[in-house]
Design a protein with these regions (language model features):
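An amphipathic, aromatic/His-enriched active-site/gating alpha helix that lines ligand/cofactor pockets
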Residues: 26, 30-38, 56-90
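Short flexible/disordered coil segments
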Residues: 8, 70-73, 96-100
Length: 100
């Protein structure tokens, strides 16, 4: 099975971590309901406090719909002034079964 993997890294401005977290939690809650979403996680680095979204999508079309969704647009707008920057990697992937 092939799918799309997204790794989006967000560096919060100093003091903004507590403001970004509830915004991200709301985004995750709504995104997990989307058609075409396989998985969507919000993580925080124990090393430097950077946030990361790790996402799996059935298709590029599903990812595109997500990026146009009201909850994604709201998160993007509300978090823009709270972040130093954001880096995104989008990969085509295929599941590998290591135990066959």
């Amino acid at each position: 099975m092939s799918f799309i993997v997204v790794m989006a890294e967000l560096a919060p401005k100093e003091g903004a971590e507590d403001k970004i977290t509830p915004l991200a939690e709301a985004l995750v809650e709504e995104t997990l309901k989307e058609e075409g979403n396989i998985d969507y996680k919000f993580l925080k680095s124990v090393k430097d406090g950077t946030f990361m979204f790790v996402e799996q999508w059935e298709s590029v079309e599903a990812l595109s719909k997500h990026m146009a969704s009201p909850h994604f647009q709201l998160f993007s707008k509300e978090s823009a002034d709270l972040a130093e920057g954001m880096g995104i990697k989008v990969l085509g992937a295929e599941e590998v079964n290591l135990y066959e």
